[in-house]
Swiss-Prot record:
One of its GO terms (cellular component) is cytosol. It comes from the Bacteria. It catalyses: uridine(54) in tRNA + (6R)-5,10-methylene-5,6,7,8-tetrahydrofolate + NADH + H(+) = 5-methyluridine(54) in tRNA + (6S)-5,6,7,8-tetrahydrofolate + NAD(+); uridine(54) in tRNA + (6R)-5,10-methylene-5,6,7,8-tetrahydrofolate + NADPH + H(+) = 5-methyluridine(54) in tRNA + (6S)-5,6,7,8-tetrahydrofolate + NADP(+). This is Methylenetetrahydrofolate--tRNA-(uracil-5-)-methyltransferase TrmFO. The keyword Oxidoreductase does not apply.
Length: 447
């Protein structure tokens, strides 16, 4: 393996952060960016870290998971967080930035570094004998996407995501639901939310009339035909959902069920199933409920489901074009390929969702690329931190149901001892523990 420099492909949020982290540790970087030579359908400029959608980096307080992640990144000298603080604009409790000023700052800080060589060209193959970070984003060029697809195997690369909402298990009303697998096959792994005929009719009407999120210009709903949105099913006919994700067959009421039901029927009229989403069973996703509804509408409509009246949504459902990998099978927590240790992946293509999360993955990949370059032990950030919980989640969740994920407190390791009921107090304790853990690892691994 050649060790004269480290390659970073893509100068978005993840790639820019990775290049900065590598260069500041004294290692030469070749940063490849095709914009300026070849444009994507999404970007408007050739600047680094261009924010193509919102100009918000979301919540600022450390009692918010993304706020905690930003504080951890700040302590690790993130160029993305530095840029955000310098170009911040008023936005209440959120961290929003001047879009052009933000990209200008990152472009200047990274490209002016004496150890960074910026090369404007399209990369169409994966380097075999050099340490390389691939951070080409959700609209990776077709040629490189095909190479990544070949490298990872036929089932290892997806071209869109259709994610169902995920809810906090502690917000489920267990008086109205029951655990059971269809036809009692295997363990009772599913939480079932039964509906009466009247409840189902009201739910279907709400779905049909709910407002959908607008599509971006580069997206085409035809790609979603193999994974139909729940609201589209509702529009296709009264019984479409009853023969799809809400079919009740094999899900009879248990004998001790005391919730509402239609007369003496042994089986509900319709059932919404919740499937465990993480090993600790603190998160559940709504099975088959991929959706394109606006987030506010998702909350309004899905809280009509019995047992979910007070559901806390850890992640709302999304449907959009998004090239991403089967990270549970393909990546290590260090963002290294399991197949080829000198190859790292970072950004949205790894299954992290959001500006800050993408930059965080680049930060971790950059640090570990340097560790590999220097023949040092790579760093695994603890699950007690936000920056450690995200790579753990995307590399340890069930591959069959893997979908891109934002950072949330639901994926951070829970506090020991009795659960603190007051949410703000609980999240404050989680944040304090995270920052203490980070201080320890910064010292231990000389970060």
């Amino acid at each position: 393996m050649k060790k004269t420099h480290i390659n970073v492909i893509g100068a978005g949020l993840a790639g820019s952060e990775a290049a900065y982290q590598i260069a500041k540790r004294g290692i030469p970087v070749k940063l490849y960016e095709m914009r300026g030579v070849k444009q994507t359908p999404q970007h408007k400029t050739d600047k680094f870290a261009e924010l193509v959608c919102s100009n918000s980096l979301r919540g600022a307080a450390i009692t918010n998971a993304v706020g905690l992640l930003k504080e951890e990144m700040r302590r690790l000298d993130s160029v993305i967080i530095k840029a955000a603080e310098v170009t911040q604009v008023p936005a209440g409790g959120a961290l929003a930035v001047d879009r052009e000023g933000f990209s200008d700052f990152v472009t200047r800080e990274v490209s002016n570094h004496p150890l960074v060589e910026v090369i404007r060209e399209e990369i169409t193959d994966l380097p075999e004998d050099e340490i390389t970070i691939i951070a080409t984003g959700p609209l990776t060029s077709d040629k490189l996407a095909e190479k990544i697809h070949e490298f990872n195997g036929a089932d290892g690369f997806y071209f869109y995501d259709a994610a169902a909402p995920i809810i906090d298990a502690n917000s489920i009303n267990f008086d109205k639901v029951y655990k059971k697998s269809r036809y009692d096959k295997g363990e009772a792994d599913y939480i079932n939310c039964p509906m009466t005929k009247e409840e189902f009719q009201a739910f279907q009407e709400a779905l049909i009339s709910a407002e959908e999120a607008p599509l971006n210009s580069f997206e085409d709903l035809k790609v979603f035909e193999g994974c139909m949105p729940i609201e589209e099913m509702a529009k296709r006919g009264y019984k479409t959902m009853l023969f799809g994700p809400m079919k009740p067959v094999g899900l009879e009421y248990p004998e001790d069920y005391k919730g509402p039901r239609d007369g003496d029927f042994k089986t509900p009229y319709a059932v919404v199933q919740l499937r465990q989403d993480n090993a600790s069973a603190s998160l559940y996703n709504i099975v088959g409920f991929q959706t394109h509804l606006k987030w506010g509408e998702q909350k309004r409509v899905f809280q009509m489901i019995p047992g979910l009246e007070n559901a806390e949504f850890v992640r709302y459902g999304v449907m959009h074009r998004n090239s991403y990998m089967d990270s549970p099978n393909l990546l290590k927590q260090t963002f290294q390929s399991r197949k080829q240790e000198n190859l790292f992946f970072a950004g949205q293509m790894t299954g992290v969702e959001g500006y800050v999360e993408s930059a965080a993955s680049g930060l971790v990949a950059g640090i570990n690329a340097v560790k590999l370059f220097n023949d040092e032990e790579v760093v695994i950030f603890p699950k007690t931190t936000a920056i450690g919980s995200l790579p753990y989640y995307i590399t340890h969740t069930d591959s069959k149901h893997f979908q891109p994920m934002n950072v949330t407190f639901g994926i951070v390791e829970e506090l020991e001892g009795p659960r603190i009921r007051d949410k703000k107090e609980r999240y404050t304790k989680v944040a304090e523990r995270a920052l203490n853990s980070l201080t320890d690892i910064i010292s231990k691994d000389n970060l």
